[in-house]
Amino acid sequence: MDSLGSVLNMDSIDVEQFVRDGFAKLEGIVPREVGDAARALLWQRIGLSPDEPSGWTQPVVWTADLTGEGPFGQFMASPKLHAALDAVAGPGGWHRRGAVGNIPVRFPRVPPADDRGWHIDSNTMRADGTWGVSTRPGTLLLLVLFSEVGTDDAPTRIRAGSHRDMVKVLEEGQVLDPMQMGPIFDEVGPDRPLALATGSPGDAYVVHPFTVHAAQEHLGTEPRFMAQMPVLLTKPLTPGDATPLARAIDW
């Protein structure tokens, strides 16, 4: 099991690692102090204190950034992030986000939540506006860290290379409900190397829409603050696309 401390140089995304493993780490898309400032705002929003662990009674508390204010806007405007998304999806191949969106805060010292199954995120909008999983994804996944995340701090688990397995089990033309696909997800890539999305405030991970991943129990001492957001593509991923997104699954 690898903890991914330095898979990139500081200037660009490792495209070949993204193609091979279905994800790549971006170190310091913003300075650490910007991540620290974002975390301070999130503590205020959830009404808890880093200095009062007695108030940490739930394994997961959800909050959000819906406006892109302050440090959150700095994350979303990061030139390094934009360059990485250009490199993976192609210039003009993705829609810029103004806000971070949903942010689950995971707490230690309490029984874990029952939300740790292997999965891929919904990636395709149906005609009625609901979302599911298909072979023509319209999103990729972005993980953004607002706290120090070590191997014990509930880092997202990633089955490296599982994107190549996942694409083979999805049926052409169907948009499936990921909530009903648990047994399928469990069987996709179980022998693949396990990687952990560790890092520092200001780091991020770009994840292929077919890469199987999962949450895990927090075994550390400090809460983990991490956003998980879809980045919309300008068109669904299609065989023959001249991008690393397509090349990663041999299209």
Regions found by a protein language model. Name each.
Residues 2-20, 27-128:
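Non-heme Fe(II)-dependent double-stranded beta-helix
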Residues 48, 84, 171, 184, ...:
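Non-heme Fe(II)/2-oxoglutarate
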Residues 87-96, 135-136, 146-152:
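Secondary-structure boundary elements
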Residues 103, 142-144, 227-231:
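A structural signal for short, well-ordered beta-strand segments
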Residues 113-118, 127-130, 152-161, 167-171, ...:
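A short secondary-structure junction signal
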Residues 120-122, 144-148, 160:
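Short, structured patches in soluble enzyme cores that scaffold and shape functional sites
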Residues 126-132, 192-193:
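Short, P/G- and charge-enriched loop/turn segments at secondary-structure junctions
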Residues 136-139, 149-212, 236:
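Double-stranded beta-helix
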